[in-house]
Amino acid sequence: MVNNCSLKTVRFVDTKQWNVKHFFATSIISKYSTESIGKHTIHITEKTKLFNEPEKEHKILGISNEKGMFDAYAELGKNINQAYIYVENGCLAYNPYRINVGSIGLKTDLQKNEYISPAYVVFKCKETILPEFLYLVLKS
């Protein structure tokens, strides 16, 4: 049996650009317009120094790939060593090191806790997109 199939390869050093963001921005063709998520969201970066209230019990949020955002635990300010991010209802948050397994959450009325570790990226939606819709798209 003769194999007439040939496999073309490109050496890595010969590639012009191996940039996933560039690929998606320039190579995906759709009859619908595509826009950056950043155009419709606001990154929340302001941090609160919970350790400045050492005797107050602060309620901390967590995120899992099964549950999304959840009330994790409460901790006294004196036991917290870093500034945390305040998360209001409608905000989304994810851990950039675990987003690939679906570790993203949406804060709703179901979560009573209000702060999350600065290890998470927190953002809210502008009026141009519903946070529930964006959450479902990102979770899929």
Each model region followed by its residue ranges:
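A short beta-sheet element
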Residues: I85, N89, A93-K139
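Glycine-anchored helix-breaking recognition loops at helix->coil/strand junctions
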Residues: M1-V10, D14-N19, K56-E57, S103-D109, ...
